[in-house]
C-alpha cells in the first residue's frame, strides 16, 4: 500500500466549481462553520450512497488549505491523479461519489498542498481503519446493527447517574487477556471479550466497565491515548458492528460501558490529523500552544469552530451510535492551562 506521505510535486490551480451531490447542504455548511453540527459524522467521511440509480460510496473531507484533493485506494491503484474530488459549492469541503464501492475498501485522501506536495491522509471521520501497521481508512456501514438493549436504555433514561451507586472496572482489552494464536497478535475480539469480561465484572460486583484506548491508534505502547481515528473503534479487536455487539452484550448483562476519550492531544503520525492539509488545521498554529512538550503530540485548536465541532460530534457519536453510557475525559488539566508541561518563558 502507498506510504502515508509523499514529496511528489504537482502544479496547482483554482478550485473547480460544482453543483454538489446533494449530501451537504447550505444548512450543513452553516452549522459546521458555527461549530454546532453535532451529527456531522453523517455528512463527512465515507458513507453508502445511491446517486442517479447507482450504488456506491460518498466521500467528503474538510481541507481549507488544500490546493486539490483526490481519493486513493486499491480501487485506483493509489493513484492521486485518478479520482479527483470537488469542493461543495464555495466551501472548504471536498466531496466525491464512487459507484460500485462497497464495505471493506481501503482508502485515503491525497491532499495537494499549495507547495505542490501530496499528503496521503486517513479520513478523520472514518468509521473503520486498517489493522496496524497499515494506516488506511476502511469503508464501513454502521447502520444495520440490531440492538436489543432497550430495557437497559429505558432504565438509563430514568436514572440520575449522579445519585446512582457506581463501581467501575477499568480495563485495557488488548492486555486483559490474550489467546495463543498468531492472528491479530492473539487479541480477543470484541465478541470474545464480551462474555468473559461480563462474567468477571458481575462476579466482582462492578456496575460498569471503563474501556481504555478504544479509538483507532497506530502505536500499541500508547494504550490508545494517541488517537488517529476518533470515529473508528480500533480494528485490533474487530469491526464497528462487533464493538456494538460488545456494548449490547454488556447492557443485556446489566453492565454499563464507559469509554476513555482523548480530546486533549493527538500524535504527529504522517497519515493522521497533524498538518492535515499542509498547514496546522486541527492543531494550533503557534507551537507554544499547538505542541505538547511532555508527550511530543499536537494540541487541538479549540478556538476553531470546525475543530470543536469535530470533537463534540465525536463524543455524541459514541453515545448515540454505540450506546455507551459515559466518557472519561483524559488529560483535562493539559486542556485548561496554557503553562501545562511548560517552563517559565515557554508559553
PLM feature spans:
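The feature marks proteins involved in alpha-glucan
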Residues: 1-54, 86-170, 175-183, 192
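Structural beta-strand segments of beta-rich domains
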Residues: 55-59
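Short proline/glycine-enriched turn/loop motifs at strand-loop junctions of beta-rich domains
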Residues: 62-69
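Short beta-strand elements bearing conserved aromatic residues within extracellular beta-rich modules
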Residues: 69-71, 107
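Substrate-binding/active-site clefts of carbohydrate-active enzymes
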Residues: 150-163, 172-347
